[in-house]
């Protein structure tokens, strides 16, 4: 007889290697074929809804690790909710209008000027949809479960129709208006930009000090006195209409080299050296309020520049007197309106000077900086020029500087409902908590929202103009356009004449001849995505508004979180979301932003081909995503190592329950040994902790909890000593079936707990566990937290034992290093204990030699009895010696009773007994 044939060794079809890049697509094809997404929705019919609303990624370019981070977090949440008693449909979306798509089309060599706007827009739509298809494939390969056949896409007619309704409702409430005021203008995009489309970068600029001569001092200043201003935008001097001083600041008149100058008193010490005023004497001090309406002359144009009082003039920098060009700045515009100044902005859409700036016509504004400075020097008005580096607004798409430029634009008035917005922010639950402060401050401080764009690819502003120039936005026109867009798409606006866009028989008092024109501007893309609560949540029967969760990157406080809040509060009076969760950015291993120029980009598609989607997903679960996260080949290697441990744990569990039938072989909880109960209690604790962590969206905690359970509780303890039972004992022995009961429970529980994070691997485990025809793991619910008898008492006892076991392990390790023993199975452990530890061991049930994975064990009361050579710790001393006896050929334990059965001279008594009873015919 071959004794090895009597061992019950593990058997499983679950492979050691995941081979994820090849296996995952097979599971995905199966899920698609079986309509798994639909089955999950059916299973959860009638359950309480939990709606995570997808913030639409922009349909341009390859997926990056930020996309993978974002979509995986969402998928983990939706999968968790779907297994936790909720109905959680997930409708993915795409943002498809805007400049990058226009630019991409232009790069293909399309001659835009040689085709109609409608034709150009068709090309944009085709391009956007190919991008959507490419990204959809990438997201599906990542294992994201959703309604991929019916996503929401902002260019679809049904979406655009609802967006028009949002605009119409806001207009009806008086929130939409047209006005000329300075807006962020991007010469590189030839369009106005919203605050959300601005990013700040360092820029080197000319900083100049300029003297404006007083022509009418109102009895306060002598004629010819110079008021000194400071600016970092010399190109705006041709648009200067005034100077602003603070009414509550003191200003001094100083005399230097026969000239008089006015600056803020508080800034004089800085300016003495900077402007060469070291020897200047103070002639008089005046209050800013006294300087109001004094008249100065523009340095090189024959026009006045009025001195005004404004709070935005401060003594923090410069001279305390602010150059004011109402056409090129927010504060300048407001004070210019107050003092009835001309709103002059002498630039065209490309940032080139018009004939309203004599001497600079046809010059690009940035080029004009040098010319203006030279002109000021020529007329003797330039006191000083230097270069500074400062934070300056840039177009987030083109990365080029933007300017403030007064143009006629359409706005959404924030002032009209700002208090409602702030109240709504307070009513939302924010994670991280600082998100509330961030958005609250943004809403509190923001100006009106410029919603018009001078571009082609977007949703047209549904506005008509009468013959007298009056803008027409009525319920009748809005409803008509909404239905036209629903039927034909928004391109109909550019394909048809005005008369074919208006309702039949439409008349208006401002058009006695029945003539109308239409607006040619489109809406800001943030209005597109910001309308999704109406176009998706409100429009789809399976979804609800407000959503339970909006979850995006932290850049969306100024973007989608903001625009969605604005449109939703405007038309419904409440926020479109109950909870908002934000994540950081994906950086490289050294914490740098990923960029092609640095050569440090890591693309999810490439990682999935090499390692598999489940590794990317496990990486997402491993990081503290609320801050910026790091990813690199080295980090993914570490994650792969954890994956390997989890997989090996599952393989061991599966291999050792191959002959276990849960229906007939399960040992009831009360009939388990204490150590088995202890493991089920630990497993139950894991269920509670993991479910709590899922609920709090703390996936990195789950990663550590499960990794720790697999490594410490299972691999290093329970599964390790189990081999002496499940391989060696008779198939149906109570101890073996008890351990298999725990293994089975652990396999089922871990598979369910990991399913939202590792959908492919857990499906593979589940198939192996349940067998052919198994219903998908993703149609199961998460395990319940159980009430287990005596759990506190058992846990306290066995936790204390585990601490002592740690000391025994250290002693064995020491003995191995000292070459006292080879494998631990050759050892005898003599444990010297104090009274407390003795009481503990007396109360424990178990074969301690087996639990310590040694051949012999002796317990001795009295620490004082331990020899000098013993390994000592606070409660115990451990003496390691070589076990006496022979090694049993079958179980490899050193026993004194090897050969007790003469028919089996190489077996110990236990093994001989098993062989005789179960394997001898």
Swiss-Prot record:
A Pfam family per the record = Anticodon_1
Primary gene name:
ileS
Cofactor annotation remark: Binds 1 zinc ion per subunit.
EC category: ligase
Please state which protein family the record places this protein in: Belongs to the class-I aminoacyl-tRNA synthetase family. IleS type 1 subfamily.
Q: Which segment of this protein is annotated as the motif 'HIGH' region?
A: 57-67
Q: What is this protein called?
A: Isoleucine--tRNA ligase
Which residues make up the binding site for ATP? Answer: 596
Q: Where in the cell is it found?
A: Cytoplasm
Q: Which UniProt keywords apply?
A: Aminoacyl-tRNA synthetase, ATP-binding, Cytoplasm, Ligase, Metal-binding, Nucleotide-binding, Protein biosynthesis, Zinc
Species in which this protein is naturally found:
Listeria welshimeri serovar 6b (strain ATCC 35897 / DSM 20650 / CCUG 15529 / CIP 8149 / NCTC 11857 / SLCC 5334 / V8)
Mind telling me which residue stretches traverse the membrane in this protein? none
Show the domain comment: IleRS has two distinct active sites: one for aminoacylation and one for editing. The misactivated valine is translocated from the active site to the editing site, which sterically excludes the correctly activated isoleucine. The single editing site contains two valyl binding pockets, one specific for each substrate (Val-AMP or Val-tRNA(Ile)).
Record-linked HAMAP family:
Ile_tRNA_synth_type1
One GO biological-process annotation of the entry reads:
isoleucyl-tRNA aminoacylation
Enzyme Commission number(s) from the entry: 6.1.1.5
| Known partners and oligomeric status | Monomer.
Q: Which residues bind L-isoleucyl-5'-AMP?
A: 552
Q: Which InterPro entries match?
A: aa-tRNA-synth_I_CS, aa-tRNA-synth_Ia, Anticodon_Ile_BEm, Ile-tRNA-ligase, Ile-tRNA-ligase_type1, Ile-tRNA_ligase, M/V/L/I-tRNA-synth_anticd-bd, Rossmann-like_a/b/a_fold
The record's annotation in NCBIfam families points to:
ileS
Q: Which cofactor does it need?
A: Zn(2+)
Domain of life of the organism in this record?
Bacteria
Q: Where is this motif: 'KMSKS' region?
A: 593-597
Task: Quote the catalytic activity from the record.
Answer: tRNA(Ile) + L-isoleucine + ATP = L-isoleucyl-tRNA(Ile) + AMP + diphosphate
Q: What are the recorded GO MF terms, alphabetically?
A: aminoacyl-tRNA deacylase activity; ATP binding; isoleucine-tRNA ligase activity; tRNA binding; zinc ion binding
Q: What does this protein do?
A: Catalyzes the attachment of isoleucine to tRNA(Ile). As IleRS can inadvertently accommodate and process structurally similar amino acids such as valine, to avoid such errors it has two additional distinct tRNA(Ile)-dependent editing activities. One activity is designated as 'pretransfer' editing and involves the hydrolysis of activated Val-AMP. The other activity is designated 'posttransfer' editing and involves deacylation of mischarged Val-tRNA(Ile).
